[in-house]
Amino acid sequence: MEESKTKRKEDRIDLKNTPPQKKSKRDSTNDETARTSLRSIMPRGYKMMENMGYKEGETLGSNESALKEPIKVEINTKRRGIRAEKPDPSTMNDMQMSEQRFIKRESEMKNNKRLKKIWYRIQKVAFEMMGDSDLYNPGEDPRDFNVLWRSYVMQLNEEVAKNDLNNHSNNDNEDKNNMIPMVNESLEASPAIKGEKFGRPSTLIDCDTSIIGSRITKDTELAELEELSIEKRITKLNIFLRSEKYYCFFCGIKYKDEGDLYEHCPGVNEDDHK
């Protein structure tokens, strides 16, 4: 017991006699650099500045409101990085909002592409089930068909026109390749017809202007349909197929009659079939 008491007394005496802790080398160097003048920090640079007309205490340059000393370099003594502090909450909110808008826009674009594919497919089904595929002739006026799948007929006409152009260009290339090169002597004009100019014969193409005029005029019925959203157009055409052919596009089944349709089909919309 006595030995432990004596040890405690000795420890207390040592704590009293211990000198205060010294500052670290980094802190001492920072204090020294803060106290020292510009002349001692950069002697060569200071001499160059004196030669250029600088005097200690005066401004740098001719402007009176200019700096009197160069910008001091603040030494970062923290262990964190330069931008490792907590971000501003206002900027974080803006970043989150922009990210949410981007995700929403991407999902809307994907859904719109998916609905366009469904709209094309249901138009094709109606075009074939109603027998218009047997009556259709390439280049026919789309207004002769039902407005619910009229845009599908227009796409068919565009595809036929593109194929015709491609075939025509391929035939022209084949004709050019098969042409026999003429001898230069045969290209020389005879003395009797030298000096005469021959114009290229103009070709007249007969066309029915009534058909062109009918196609140029605006299709108001189709414009009214396209004002509706794609979901409403799909629903409208599906209702038409259900009433006319007892067929549900989302079921993919042609029912026997109206009773069989309403008994087994869950609904008109796509969401009803999920």
From Swiss-Prot:
Transmembrane feature ranges: none
Keyword terms of this UniProt record: Cytoplasm, Nucleus
GO cellular component, one term: nucleus
InterPro entries: DUF4187, G_patch_dom, GPATCH11
Location of region: Disordered: 1-40
GO MF, any single term: nucleic acid binding
Note: Present with 1470 molecules/cell in log phase SD medium.
Protein name: Uncharacterized protein YLR271W
